[in-house]
């Protein structure tokens, strides 16, 4: 994954915002992969990434969660997407989904702007939705914002949905990570996934204080 402006290490990049949320010029989001997307290059496994020569330039670091698999990947222009679900589930039928979107070259969007746009889209798609702040600040020198969205009844699935979203503003690209549930997550699940999201960070081999592992 060298010699590219932004590369990925063990990441999953996903474009399924369950209620049709959109941040930048994103094709219509649905519960199926958008037909206009083409398959993206295969994301390396954890073992292959760890034995590589190292990362170059700006990278999003996010390990594949234990018990999960990459079930869909694609890229269209500057938008890279992947969806990850439990090994026994699929993107068509899931209980928990991990989502990341990478907007390559997008440097004008802030986490606050992303939160406002996505939250409004969520509210427009689901009646009686709720949104709650979780955390904000900087991690490894990059600004981020983490918040929760709740839909009591998704009209397209007839199920409740809880989602935690983490937006990170890089120097080269913009990153959006999502953990979604079609059930009310337990306290243990919330703790588990908050720890996971805290570990999702951006690094840059060109900046010593933000160096990649």
Locate the predicted segments by residue.
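Bacterial N-terminal signal peptides
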Residues: 10-20
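Ser/Thr-rich, Proline-interspersed low-complexity disordered segments
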Residues: 21-47, 51
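N-terminal "mature-domain start" segment
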Residues: 42-80
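Secretory pathway targeting signatures of secreted, lumenal, and periplasmic proteins
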Residues: 66-108
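Short, solvent-exposed recognition patches
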Residues: 102-130
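Signature of long, low-cysteine stretches enriched in small and polar/charged residues
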Residues: 120-166
């Amino acid at each position: 994954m060298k010699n590219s402006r932004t590369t990925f290490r063990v990441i999953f990049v996903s474009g399924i915002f369950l209620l049709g949320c959109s941040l930048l010029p994103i094709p219509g989001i649905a519960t199926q992969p958008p037909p206009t997307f083409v398959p993206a290059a295969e994301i390396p496994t954890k073992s292959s990434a760890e034995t590589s020569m190292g990362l170059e330039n700006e990278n999003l670091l996010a390990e594949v969660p234990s018990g999960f698999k990459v079930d869909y990947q694609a890229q269209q222009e500057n938008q890279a997407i992947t969806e990850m679900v439990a090994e026994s589930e699929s993107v068509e039928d899931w209980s928990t989904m991990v989502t990341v979107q990478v907007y390559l070259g997008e440097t004008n969007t802030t986490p606050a702007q992303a939160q406002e746009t996505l939250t409004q889209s969520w509210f427009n798609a689901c009646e009686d939705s709720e949104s709650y702040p979780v955390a904000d600040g900087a991690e490894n020198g990059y600004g981020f914002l983490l918040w929760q969205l709740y839909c009591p009844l998704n009209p397209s699935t007839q199920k409740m949905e809880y989602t935690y979203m983490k937006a990170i503003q890089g120097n080269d690209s913009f990153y959006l990570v999502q953990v979604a549930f079609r059930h009310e997550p337990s306290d243990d699940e919330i703790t588990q996934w908050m720890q996971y999201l805290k570990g999702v960070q951006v690094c840059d081999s060109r900046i010593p204080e933000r160096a990649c592992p």
